[in-house]
Amino acid sequence: NLQKAYDEGSQIKAATHEYRGVTYVWEVIKNIEKAMSLSGGIYNFGSGNTLNSYSIFTEAANMMGLKEPSKFILPDTERFSDQERNLTMDCSLIEKHGIHFNDSTEGIKEAVLRPFRTE
């Protein structure tokens, strides 16, 4: 947890060889109704991402207003260095049905700006 590490003065490591999407829950809620009318099949459902975990962590810390994220978020260059870990999703199929998710960075920004969104 970024806020906790910052508040406690502790450090966390984030992998530079790992890629994963982070989806703002409100986007899931907004899109779930649309997904209910899809024909049967396998669909990836969530935010895309091109940044590694370390970059996502530092971007999120900056958006949260946490000062000098490089002092408490450390790049873990060894984890997954033998084989890059890519957990990102290709959502092009679901997008063809009008279901769109912002990328992870935009989703995090929305969550920071409007954490208790009700619309």
Report each predicted region and the residues it spans.
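Residues that recognize and position ribonucleotide moieties
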Residues: 12, 21, 49-50, 87
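Hydrophobic residues at beta-strand termini and immediately following loops
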Residues: 14-15, 45, 104
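NAD(P)-dependent short-chain dehydrogenase/reductase
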Residues: 1-20, 25-30
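Conserved residues at beta->alpha junctions
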Residues: 19, 47, 98
